[in-house]
Amino acid sequence: MSKRLIATLAGAMAIAIVAAGCGSSDDGTETAVVLTKTEFIAQGDAICKKGSEQIEDEANAFAEENDIDTNKPTKEEQEEVISGVLGPALQKQADEISALGAPDGEEEKTEAIVAALESGAEELEDDPGTLLEESGTGPLDKANELANKFGFKECGQE
């Protein structure tokens, strides 16, 4: 597994930790703010960028804590990082993007992106070896394709 992938894995996990600590008070008087597509993309890309950075940090910490040689990790070590760091982190990113609320008229597209990301994250947790396979489509291909078509610049990048 490359350092970049491990880094990406670590960043997603860190987002999950940070987001879990964030709460909001809801007194029932708040009104929902509907983002424009441009605002949605900007905020979504910020979530993905921060997530990638945190995935990198978390993957590096995980590798250090478990004495994983990031230059020559075994397949089992790679799978452990993918299922333990990347999958949960990507699920958290999906949750955060979903929480932004879809721009008017873009509900189906944004729901499809989130659903594809959730599906990919679940597959990575359940069968991390799919990310390491060099043939066929990967568990994140659909989410990446949909995110790119929607206009994301950070989300949907490998």
Question: Across the structure, where does each feature detected by a protein language model lie?
Answer:
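Alpha-helical segments in soluble extracytoplasmic regions
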Residues: 36-125, 133-157
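C-terminal motif of bacterial Sec signal peptides marking the signal peptidase cleavage site
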Residues: 18-21
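Alpha-helical transmembrane segments
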Residues: 12-16
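Enrichment for repetitive, rod-forming helical segments
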Residues: 10-11, 116
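Extracellular mucin-like PTS domains
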Residues: 29-33
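Bacterial signal peptide processing site
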Residues: 23-26
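Bacterial N-terminal signal peptides that target proteins for export
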Residues: 1-10
